[in-house]
Regions:
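Major-groove recognition helix of helix-turn-helix-like DNA-binding domains
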Residues: 94, 121-127
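Helix-turn-helix DNA-binding helix
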Residues: 114, 118-121
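Short Lys/Arg-enriched helix C-cap and helix-to-coil transition segments
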Residues: 132-139
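…primarily DNA-binding HTH/wHTH and HhH modules…
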Residues: 142-167
């Protein structure tokens, strides 16, 4: 399988993104996570990894105004095949959280049919393969606390501040 990647600078650090010919399938930051990612890919002989800036031009054009604090709509097709059915429901529901707003883990659990599954929702957020585009940073604790974030709470806070969310 051909897998394309790019890297680019952002206010939250350098971002690594991957895609197949048709779909965006992975975003990671900060840069300290890249080594683990590349090591895992090298073990899979079926993956042909190639850097290709052109395949990400639309994504980069969308990120630029996003990081400038403008509301944008990411238009990439997303590959969610790596998730469980529950995770996919959580990720698709997160896509509906409006820019600049936050929702609680409990709210998200109720939306996906499990009012007592806030912890499971938190794990699904942590397993999100395409952060920012799938806005897991908009999910916070019921008491208004930030909760967790794979990129670290300072990055979560920064993303919410960029969006003008009240935290």
């Amino acid at each position: 399988m051909k897998l394309y990647y790019t890297t680019f600078k952002s206010p939250v650090g350098e971002i690594l993104a991957t895609r197949t010919e048709n779909v965006l399938n992975f975003i990671t930051f900060p840069k300290s996570t890249w080594q683990r990612f590349f090591s895992a890919l090298k073990k899979d002989e079926n993956i042909d990894l190639k850097k290709d800036e052109k395949k990400f031009s639309s994504l980069k054009k969308t990120f630029k105004p996003y990081f400038a604090g403008k509301k944008v709509k990411f238009k990439e097709s997303l590959d969610l095949t790596g998730g469980t059915p529950f995770q996919k429901r959580v990720w698709k529901t997160m896509l509906k959280i409006p820019y600049g707003q936050t929702k609680s883990y409990g709210w998200l659990a109720r939306q996906v049919g499990g009012k007592n599954k806030a912890r499971a929702v938190g794990y699904a957020c942590g397993a999100n393969p395409i952060p920012i585009v799938i806005p897991c940073h908009r999910v916070i604790r019921e008491d208004g606390g930030l909760g967790g974030y794979g990129g670290g709470l300072s990055i979560k806070r920064k993303l919410l501040k960029i969006e003008g969310a009240k935290i």
